UniProtKB/Swiss-Prot annotation:
UniProt similarity note: Belongs to the GlnD family.
Region (Uridylyltransferase): 1-342
EC code: 2.7.7.59, 3.1.4.-
Protein name: Bifunctional uridylyltransferase/uridylyl-removing enzyme
Pfam families: ACT, GlnD_UR_UTase, HD, NTP_transf_2
Residue intervals of the HD domain: 461-583
Record keywords: Hydrolase, Magnesium, Multifunctional enzyme, Nucleotidyltransferase, Repeat, Transferase
Catalysed reactions listed for this entry: [protein-PII]-L-tyrosine + UTP = [protein-PII]-uridylyl-L-tyrosine + diphosphate; [protein-PII]-uridylyl-L-tyrosine + H2O = [protein-PII]-L-tyrosine + UMP + H(+)
Free-text function comment from the UniProt entry: Modifies, by uridylylation and deuridylylation, the PII regulatory proteins (GlnB and homologs), in response to the nitrogen status of the cell that GlnD senses through the glutamine level. Under low glutamine levels, catalyzes the conversion of the PII proteins and UTP to PII-UMP and PPi, while under higher glutamine levels, GlnD hydrolyzes PII-UMP to PII and UMP (deuridylylation). Thus, controls uridylylation state and activity of the PII proteins, and plays an important role in the regulation of nitrogen assimilation and metabolism.
Amino acid sequence: MPQMDPELFDRGQFQAELALKSSPIAAFKKAIRHAREVLDARFKGGRDIRRLVEDRAWFVDQILQEAWKRFAWSEDADIALLAVGGYGRGELHPYSDIDLLILLDSSDHEIFREPIEGFLTLLWDIGLEVGQSVRSVDECAEEARADLTVITNLMESRTIAGPEHLRQRMQQVTSSEQMWPSKHFYLAKREERKARHAKYNDTEYNLEPNVKGSPGGLRDIQTVLWVARRQFGTLNLQALVGQGFLLESEYALLSSSQEFLWKVRYALHMLAGRAEDRLLFDYQARIAALFGYQDGDGKRSIEHFMQKYYRVVMGISELSDLINQHFEEVILRAGESGPATPLNSRFQVRDGYIEVTHPNVFKRTPFAILEVFVLMAQNPEIKGVRADSIRLLRDSRHLIDDDFRKDIRNTSLFIELFKCKEGIHRNLRRMNRYGILGRYLPEFGHIVGQMQHDLFHIYTVDAHTLNLIKHLRKFRWPELAEKFPLASKLIDRLPKPELIYLAGLYHDIGKGRGGDHSELGAVDAEAFARRHQLPAWDSALIVWLVQHHLVMSTTAQRKDLSDPQVIHDFAQFVGDQTHLDYLYVLTVADINATNPSLWNSWRASLLRQLYTETKRALRRGLENPLDREEQIRQTQSAALDILVRGGTDPDDAEQLWSQLGDDYFLRHTANDVAWHTEAILQHPADSGPLVLIKETTQREFEGGTQIFIYAPDQHDFFAVTVAAMSQLNLNIHDARIITSTSQFTLDTYVVLDADGGSIGDNPARIKQIREGLIEALKNPDEYPTIIQRRVPRQLKHFAFAPQVTIHNDAQRPVTILELTAPDRPGLLARIGRIFLEYDLSLQNAKIATLGERVEDVFFVTDANNQPLSDPELCARLQETIVRRLSEPSAQPQSLQIDI
């Protein structure tokens, strides 16, 4: 720390200020304000961050010493003021904790009670927020023995004022000889680190990471230092080089990474004006600009900055793991190493960990760089790689060049990994962590740490890719067969499972370059297959899956699956059962690996429906498609059988059906038609709206809640219905609107509750929904359709202009209106009002929310039940929707993620 820095704090000038003022508080506050301005200016001017955090700690030392002097401590008083924790290390960010220990020789605090209280009150009055404790030396020993946090803080202490001998005594009584021997300390810190990582989902790749506590954050570096200090007495990272725990290159990487995170943390505190260690969306773009990042190479400035951040913390995690593995071997298993079990001439297993048989293995036989991961997959009982061998792997990465990538031994080993029955995900993750995967596949290296700046994709591209492969593996777990029944069955039937893993590895590899990532990825996948000499059929399937990995999800999401033509077109697209099976399994894994909130029961039901209907179409033969008339006849016949068995007069049913039109029977199953018909025939015409509620399926992990409404068609009926459902905390995923020739509306909605599940067997909730809808629909003109809700913080950072496309369906007499817009309260109700103004009839709607945006599809007709044919009308409609949804009140609403 600096000995003197008059620009930051001029003691003479400060004391002169004190002498002029009746109260010292103003002088202290002025000094603190001035120092903050100076330090912020130095930061913006590019001051070395290490100097900067030391400068701030030095300044706080001066302020505390001046404050301490204002109280009547006798010269021989056995009381001292100590800095502990991060402040004790001499590191302070703008709003870091200032942890103080007032250390006494005696446990009799009373004799110093009054000056201590006065000192702490002064600190509070001048705006210096401190964390303080008052203890005797013996009390320090007692509390440190019982509390890991206390002993950790006391290990890093400095005397600010008072006699130094008190601190030295405290250090003696809390040394590893007295308490917390290094083995126990390491075990406790290991568990603490594990719990901390779990708090942040065990990933470096959170959308809004904590630069201090997240995996790969500053706390991981500090944990290494704490353990090293307890074991070896080392005071800094560089000392670990002398102990043999770090190479010079590793020290340089850790040191530069720490400096980068310090800069980010300093900027966070400065921008937030408070202690803020979360890299929130609020600050990401501002820090990217502050650090000079710019748009380019197909990425926005914020994505460049966050990729740098993620790569830094991944590097810290890698080195932290390496050092902790060393600690395991030196501290926990010192002198207890067991015999080695040979695997081959290059590798052996010792104490459950694989290691090289000699230090030149990778230099002499470079293919061993990939072989080690195959061996671990083939021997799943191996826990991991020993620290020295990890270091050799890291140091051998330069051997992976173009010649290495073309070597048939290496290409064969890489493919062999994907044929292993276990450990594919685990070892790909290790390869990524050790920097091998991105080196062997440069196109994969490009996506390491690549974020997408939205709330839909909550992982970086590389983390999502490995997560997808993990989900493919999990489909084989018996305990998940109930949640993923179809995927679990199909994964074992795929003729070559390794192909779906390879397709998964490449499905998003084209992201971050600009252009269509599916097309770019398909080109890379084809080059990979050629380099690895895969058979033509295998290569073609992988490329097809990569190129079309979004098609099944998009079809299920945005197309009307009740339309036989949609099913026929999709069956023609996949071509055969094998392609359908592979694509379904890949799609389910992709959705689950994108965001845990995406996979809900309704999406599962849609994909199963598309899979099942397509399978039937393939069995029937693509040359024999099911036509509309045949499907209508089948539905009516089956529904009539159900009704007659239940005692319904078939003539009454057919008279009602004659008013409904063909689309009703295309969009509903026979069971639903019978359910609706029986209820309508029994419902008195003058008794208000009929509202029916039931589950779409009895499968536990599939389906949603179906709400059927039968009532006279009225002004603003759709807008009121969806507004009422919003007030009832229901999320609409599907809407089917039928108007009978007798001017009754038959509306069917599929909804999920606010938690993403169906309503289920909950009589009280069902009663609440039914009564709420009936009450709203009795007087729709009086019901407010504009919902006012607070905008969640995260959504405020993803505003964009709504986009509307309008085109006519080539197969059916309807117009398709596709909307992409920021999520917002009452959006469907506003759309319904616009349709009313333009005298449009809504036939069907597919509702989807992807993070911060909606992607909805509406199927509409004009007043004569015909598709829109006037280009000027379509242009006005498009302009109206964009303008209304762009109004200041049209802000994003609460987050409901669905694909």
